[in-house]
């Protein structure tokens, strides 16, 4: 009887503690060919405090985890790291990347070419691609779960195609039905 109670408690305690299924950009592009889905790339730097906060708070929110996993291939990309990306017939690297480098606030001036070509200049930055790996848009800056939710939804539902002005965006936000309770 104690075993049953223990196992039941263990199962109940593990429900809802999922994680975002982070994969590499190359893996996301490969998966997208088999099962089309939008891609969310979370660009970060190891020294970035707001990136860590977003990873430890925003991306730990259960509603955000579920929404991201259901609607996107999620890529966590170290913009100053050495990951090699094959994208649109080109290879992107960080030619001056040194895995033994000292990590210091403000970076070391060595950015991955993939981040550069997408115009990523600050961290964190989220970049979104459609189901055919075409760039949709990017959103720089830290977002709390409730702040991030409408950005995810506007991309996932293709509502972004209807938003042309700041007024359109403000109307979208005003009418947005939040699931995140914070």
Residue ranges of model-derived segments:
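Bacterial Sec-dependent N-terminal signal peptides
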Residues: 1-20
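A short beta-strand-turn-helix
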Residues: 21-39, 68
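Short active-site neighborhood of thiol/selenol oxidoreductases, capturing the structured segment around
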Residues: 35-49, 74
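Structural micro-motif
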Residues: 38, 93-102, 111-127
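C-type cytochrome heme c attachment motif
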Residues: 46-53, 124-127
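Typically the conserved alpha-helix immediately C-terminal to a functionally engaged Cys/Sec
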Residues: 52-69
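Structural microenvironment flanking redox-active thiols in thiol-disulfide oxidoreductases
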Residues: 67-87
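Non-globular targeting/processing and membrane-anchoring segments
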Residues: 119, 130, 136-182
